[in-house]
Every structure is written in structure tokens, then in C-alpha cells.
């Protein structure tokens, strides 16, 4: 008998105790058919690929930063912190989440491992989100305050942001364990999930998502305004077009000089400013895509995480799984987006692989 086609139906062949007592009959003693439908195998393969690719890509970014000496500075320390959080998501969180899906969202690995998994899940995902926020803030200050935001200041601020990111993530993830703020494991129903206590739901979702969401949206709005202001300033520094050549003659009889102006537009713009503007435009585009993907990946999950405990809504398990894995996929997209807009990473990757042969 094929299992229902959804993420939550990748159940193992061993039935639950209730099913054993009430549903086993003569017909159930016949040989079982394949555990997973074709669609289930495809989904399982896709999720397995997502886990492996997320781990490999973030590990590559992290290894490159550690190996290349020129990357041992800002903003690459922020990228390294993001890669650490994302590689931990792929190594510690996603595999157990995949096992959870295969078990039909029934947790059969005990209370301690459940608590550890949930704590790692909240810690690593929250750190990943706040690392994106830190990168956006660093880009914002480097674009809008490049004279004041010196290398020393930038290094100090980035280290503080990294420390605050992991400290806040640890507080949010460990609060249920340290303060008894709700329960993550139910032995009777074999459930393992983030605490459903309404007060903790508000605290965790605001601290892990809604607050950084407000920060990144504000930051990108300011970056957009700064970019528009620069374009406006560049226009005011240019001379209006001249339709025809103009001759200017000196009024003095001796000697007589004639000036002919044939250029349509004269723009006063140092070459250094042009290079800086191009760099800032790439940075603004990178931040915009990074923020956009971050919002699209995580907002469905955090909306349900906030609404469900407050209204006691019963959200179908299939949607919980989809929203959860959509959020996990953000850890796959983060390094792709950042390295795609940085030519130094592309050349560093080529050198990294060429040295292996």
C-alpha cells in the first residue's frame, strides 16, 4: 500500500503502539509494498541534495576565508560567521529534521536528543538570520558613511555584531531549557517541536525574525535613498547641453583669442568616485537580493510560528514541513548570493581547486 503523497508521510514501516493495538489484522500480515511512493522518493532525494549542497557550499566558503590571507578582515569575518551558522544548520539540524520527516513527524529518539536538536535548530537558524542583518548593516554604513566608517571602526563594529548575534541566538534557543519556558517534547504523542507557550512564541519569533526583518528593511530603504541622492548630485554637477558650438572672443584688440566650445556636456566627477559608485551599486544589489531571499524563505514559517500558538490553530503538517524546509533553504542561498557578487571569491575558488590537483 503506497503511503499518502506528502512530506509528512515518509513514515517508517514500524507502526505506532496505538496502531499496533487497534489496526493490525490478517490483511496487515501480508508482505508490505515499497515504503515510499515515487513522489516521496523524489522529495527525499531533493531534500538530501539540499542538505549536502548546503553543507558543502558553506564549508567551501569557510575554508576559503580561512585559507586566503586577504580575507582575514572585514567584511569577510561577517561572511565567515554566516557560513559557520549555515554549515551548522546543514550538519546538525537538517539531517535530524529529515529523519523526523521520514518518521511521519513522530520523534522516536528520546527527550534529550529532542531538546538538543530544538536548541541547535533555534540557535543556528537565529544566528544565520542575524548574520544576514549584520552584513546588511555593514554594507549600509560602508556606503553611507565611508569617510567615518574606517577600517579600525569597521573591524570593531563587526566583531561586536558577531558577538551579539551568537549571544542573542543562545538566549533565545536556551530559554525553554534554562527557565522551563514551555515543553519541546511530548512522550505520549511522540512530538518534538519548538515550545508552543504563547509568551515564548512571541519572544522567540520577534527576537529571531521580526526584529531583524525590521532592521534589514530599514537598512535597504536607507541604501536606496542614498543611491538616489548620489544620482541626483551627479546630475547637478554637470553642465547643460549646448546645441551649437559657441565662440568666445576677447574684447581686447591685442592679442585676439578665440575659444570654441564643442562639448555637449561637461561632468565634474573624479575617477575614484566612479569606481566607488560602481562598487556601491554592486553592494546595494547584493544586499537587496540577500534580503529579498531571506524574507521569502523565512516569512511563511515565522508567520505560522507566531499565529499558531496564539490562536490555537491547527496548521496541516504538510504545510509546516514545507515552510520549515523553505526556511532551511535560506542557508543554501546565502553563500551563493554573497559570492556571486564578489569577484575575489570566484578567483579564490579557482585557486583553491587548482591547488588540490
UniProtKB/Swiss-Prot annotation:
Residues 64-76, 138-155, 221-287, 340-357 are cytoplasmic. Changing residue 284 to R: Strongly increased G(i)/(o)-coupled receptor activity. Changing residue 204 to C: Decreased G(i)/(o)-coupled receptor activity. Changing residue 286 to A: Slightly decreased G(i)/(o)-coupled receptor activity. Residues 1-36, 104-114, 177-198, 313-314 are extracellular. The keyword ATP-binding does not apply. GO terms for biological process: adenylate cyclase-activating G protein-coupled receptor signaling pathway; adenylate cyclase-inhibiting serotonin receptor signaling pathway; chemical synaptic transmission; G protein-coupled receptor signaling pathway; G protein-coupled receptor signaling pathway, coupled to cyclic nucleotide second messenger; hippocampus development; response to estradiol. Serotonin binds at residue 121. Coiled coil: none annotated. It comes from the Eukaryota. Changing residue 287 to A: Abolished G(i)/(o)-coupled receptor activity. Disulfide bonds join 114-192. GO terms for cellular component: dendrite; perikaryon; plasma membrane; postsynaptic specialization membrane. Its main location: membrane. It is found in: Cell membrane. The keyword Disulfide bond applies. It is a multi-pass membrane protein. Keywords: Cell membrane, Disulfide bond, G-protein coupled receptor, Glycoprotein, Membrane, Receptor, Transducer, Transmembrane, Transmembrane helix. G-protein coupled receptor for 5-hydroxytryptamine (serotonin), a biogenic hormone that functions as a neurotransmitter, a hormone and a mitogen. Also functions as a receptor for ergot alkaloid derivatives and other psychoactive substances. Ligand binding causes a conformation change that triggers signaling via guanine nucleotide-binding proteins (G proteins) and modulates the activity of downstream effectors. This is 5-hydroxytryptamine receptor 5A.
Amino acid at each position: 500500500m503506497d503511503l499518502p503523497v506528502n512530506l509528512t508521510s515518509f513514515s517508517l514501516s514500524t507502526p505506532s503502539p496505538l496502531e499496533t493495538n487497534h489496526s493490525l489484522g490478517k490483511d496487515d500480515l501480508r508482505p508490505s509494498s515499497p515504503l515510499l511512493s515515487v513522489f516521496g522518493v523524489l522529495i527525499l532525494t531533493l531534500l538530501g541534495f539540499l542538505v549536502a549542497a548546503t553543507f558543502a557550499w558553506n564549508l567551501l566558503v569557510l575554508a576559503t576565508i580561512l585559507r586566503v590571507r586577504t580575507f582575514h578582515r572585514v567584511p569577510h569575518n561577517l561572511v565567515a560567521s554566516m557560513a559557520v551558522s549555515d554549515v551548522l544548520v546543514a550538519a546538525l539540524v537538517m539531517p535530524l529534521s529529515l529523519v523526523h520527516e521520514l518518521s511521519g513527524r513522530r520523534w522516536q529518539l528520546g527527550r534529550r536528543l529532542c531538546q538538543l536538536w530544538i536548541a541547535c535548530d533555534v540557535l543556528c537558524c537565529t544566528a544565520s538570520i542575524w548574520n544576514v542583518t549584520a552584513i546588511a548593516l555593514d554594507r549600509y554604513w560602508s556606503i553611507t558613511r565611508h569617510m567615518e566608517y574606517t577600517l579600525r571602526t569597521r573591524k570593531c563594529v563587526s566583531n561586536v555584531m558577531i558577538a551579539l548575534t551568537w549571544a542573542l541566538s543562545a538566549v533565545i534557543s536556551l530559554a525553554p531549557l534554562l527557565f522551563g519556558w514551555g515543553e519541546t517534547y511530548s512522550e505520549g504523542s511522540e512530538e518534538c517541536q519548538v515550545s508552543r507557550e504563547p509568551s515564548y512564541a512571541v519572544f522567540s519569533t520577534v527576537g529571531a525574525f521580526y526584529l531583524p526583518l525590521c532592521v534589514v528593511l530599514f537598512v535597504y530603504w536607507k541604501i536606496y535613498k542614498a543611491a538616489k541622492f548620489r544620482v541626483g548630485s551627479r546630475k547637478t554637477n554637470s553642465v547643460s547641453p549646448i546645441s551649437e558650438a559657441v565662440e568666445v572672443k576677447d574684447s581686447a584688440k591685442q592679442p585676439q583669442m578665440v575659444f570654441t566650445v564643442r562639448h555637449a556636456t561637461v561632468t565634474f566627477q573624479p575617477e575614484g568616485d566612479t569606481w566607488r559608485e560602481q562598487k556601491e551599486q554592486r553592494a546595494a544589489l547584493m544586499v537587496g537580493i540577500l534580503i529579498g531571499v531571506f524574507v521569502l524563505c523565512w516569512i511563511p514559517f515565522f508567520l505560522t510560528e507566531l499565529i499558531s500558538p496564539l490562536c490555537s490553530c491547527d496548521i496541516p503538517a504538510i504545510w509546516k514541513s514545507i515552510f520549515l524546509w523553505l526556511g532551511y533553504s535560506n542557508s543554501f542561498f546565502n553563500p551563493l548570493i554573497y559570492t556571486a557578487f564578489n569577484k575575489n571569491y570566484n578567483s579564490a575558488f579557482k585557486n583553491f581547486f587548482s591547488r588540490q590537483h
